[in-house]
């Protein structure tokens, strides 16, 4: 799924602690720019994933502006479902990418974001019954709890994710709904992760 990073200039949208920035450099990237809105995360990224080829910038990805053809690879890990205007950002991303450039991203799966609560339904004994999927075709704002705090996310259908790329001239190269690997099935709760997808991975080319 990952592209060849050798001598590439990379933009990481929603870079968090900079793990993917470091990965890009490890794989031979010439330069990596990590962008995130969280000052705390960027401070930590500077501590644990600092490198002469990595720079960090604090900004909302929707507010970013770069010249056309600035990057060979643009990636985003579990951040785009926090963006309200996905089509406008995709249009920018295509402009920022060089010809044949790669756009690679992961988001929470639309099945996972549809209902909003992002939690299982349990019986009176606390046993899992099922995972709720409701209001799937009603796109827009959802309130969820993440690490004990209420956060706002934006639900989109799978069709919207794919067609937004296609309408903006991207070529879809790969789409993956990752399942837990077999060697993790003995871990507590892991078998339940086979009951619904949690993430969606997409790779497209300009």
Regions found by a protein language model. Name each.
Residues 72-87:
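A short SAM/SAH-binding and catalytic strip from SAM-dependent methyltransferases
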Residues 102-140:
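Conserved class I S-adenosyl-L-methionine
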Residues 168-170, 188-206:
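Core SAM-dependent methyltransferase catalytic element
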Residues 87-102:
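A short glycine-rich, Lys/Arg-flanked "PGG" loop and its adjoining helix->strand segment in the class I
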Residues 107, 111-120, 145-160:
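Acceptor-substrate binding/catalytic loop of class I
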Residues 62-73:
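A short acidic, Gly/Pro-enriched loop at the edge of an enzyme's catalytic core
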Residues 9-64:
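Class I SAM-dependent methyltransferase SAM/SAH-binding core
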Residues 152-175:
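Short alpha-helix
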């Amino acid at each position: 799924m990952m592209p060849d990073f050798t001598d590439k200039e990379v933009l990481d949208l929603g870079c968090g602690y900079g793990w993917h920035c470091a990965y890009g450099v490890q794989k031979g990237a010439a330069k990596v720019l990590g962008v995130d809105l969280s000052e705390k995360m960027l401070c930590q990224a500077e501590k644990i994933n600092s490198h002469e080829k990595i720079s960090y910038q604090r900004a909302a990805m929707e507010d970013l502006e770069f010249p056309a053809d600035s990057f060979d690879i643009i990636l985003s890990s579990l951040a785009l479902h926090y963006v309200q205007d996905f089509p406008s950002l995709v249009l920018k991303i295509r402009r920022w990418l060089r010809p044949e450039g790669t756009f690679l991203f992961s988001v929470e799966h639309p099945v996972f974001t549809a209902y909003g609560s992002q939690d299982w339904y349990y019986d009176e004994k606390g046993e899992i019954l099922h995972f709720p999927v409701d209001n799937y075709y009603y796109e827009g704002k959802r309130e969820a709890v993440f690490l004990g705090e209420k956060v706002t996310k934006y639900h989109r259908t799978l069709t919207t994710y794919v067609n937004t790329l296609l309408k903006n001239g991207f070529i879809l190269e790969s789409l993956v709904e990752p399942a837990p690997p077999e060697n993790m099935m003995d871990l507590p709760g892991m078998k339940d992760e086979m009951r619904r997808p949690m993430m969606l991975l997409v790779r497209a080319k300009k």
